[in-house]
Amino acid sequence: VEDVIFKNNTVNGVVVNWTPVLREGMHVDPLNILAKIVVDGTGHDSEIAATVARKNGIRLATETGGVIGERSLDVVAGEDEVVNGTKEIYPGLYVCGMAASAVSGTPRMGPIFGGMLMSGKKVADEIIAKLKK
């Protein structure tokens, strides 16, 4: 994902390109993929959330309005807080997993991954509930 589709102050999809095009510097238009919901599960860099905030001058649902950045490792706190940070951070954009930790400024978690599974389940459940409305 190199960008998002942003219309009416809502994230409406993603803009993607493929590696050979980028590697060879080919002048090929990227693909636009429309979506009712976009999930940033890009990990420690939270690339989609960072792009949305940077390019559109908006405030995310965080203490600072931007991507706070993950804190140093604390396995116990990280396991709980990755689930708590899993949420919709801007209309049409959810975060889960380590992207949720990076966006919310919570600790990374180390080698125990129960929180990652619970984060994935939570984001799926929230999206299903939203789409049913």
Predicted regions, residues:
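Residues forming the flavin
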Residues: V1-K133
